[in-house]
Swiss-Prot record:
It is found in: Cytoplasm. Its EC number is 2.7.2.8. It comes from Parasynechococcus marenigrum (strain WH8102). Gene3D superfamilies: Acetylglutamate kinase-like (3.40.1160.10). PANTHER family: N-ACETYLGLUTAMATE SYNTHASE, N-ACETYLGLUTAMATE SYNTHASE, MITOCHONDRIAL. The record marks K35, K249 as: Transition state stabilizer. This is Acetylglutamate kinase. NCBIfam families: argB (TIGR00761). It holds the Pfam family AA_kinase. Signal peptide: none annotated. GO terms for cellular component: cytoplasm. Substrate binds at G70, G71, R92, N186. The keyword Transit peptide does not apply.
Amino acid sequence: MPEPIQSGDDALRVSVLSEALPYIQRFSGRRIVIKYGGAAMAHAELREAVFRDLALLACVGVQPVVVHGGGPEINQWLKRLEIPAEFRDGLRVTDADTMDVVEMVLVGRVNKQIVNGLNQLGTRAVGLSGSDGSLVEARPWGDGSHGLVGDVARVNPDVLEPLLERGYVPVISSVAATPGDGRAHNINADTVAGELAAALEAEKLILLTDTPGILRDRDNPNSLIRKLRLSEARQLIDDGVVAGGMTPKTECCIRALAQGVSAAHIVDGRVPHALLLEVFTDAGIGTMVVGRG
């Protein structure tokens, strides 16, 4: 007679797999754009957890698209090369020397580290920058006083379609060129992820951050708002509940939803396997913003 299944950890694993099943069925064949950065990129154990999450998503038929930043490593290289780092209005002021470092780090180092990490797990990852195939066309941000800081002028999703159809996972750095002069610009990775999600008609946009999500009280991590309608997210910005660095992330979610993305999530990337917990469990771990409902 077979022994009964162990209680405790074994039963919990079975329960988690069972809970994930309807979500796996629902999102198989769907596209999810993930912005990867912050603490989830800086610590080896969290990096490995993110890579495994992405590999599992791909294994069960989800089509993940990864957009990444790399601020901490950029700062390390600027310091090593004795180039001063300057931030204004929450954006990195980017002169020509700084842009050279940004492009080297994001396109040449961080992007390949992510691609190699995914490929080692059997995932077929392909590294791109926004400039490749004019995937993302840039325009100068604001009045140009921040130097080579850019915004998204246009997205050409046709570059990604053949890759996604063949089961590849695109890994995209947030560097793109202006079409007129071909100059590389540094674009906020959240912005690139949001615009790509809209252009790809993605099911979800997920921003991995260094906070639990949108908080009712920014000083109280237990005040996490689990779910918001689009109109409620706008109201929180107007009321000043969403402020500081959370404002552009929330605005990014709002823009993506307004362009047809089904749901946008702000998730704590410091939590191991945050992606799977958000996508494949009933409760999730972050804030989900939806267009309606």
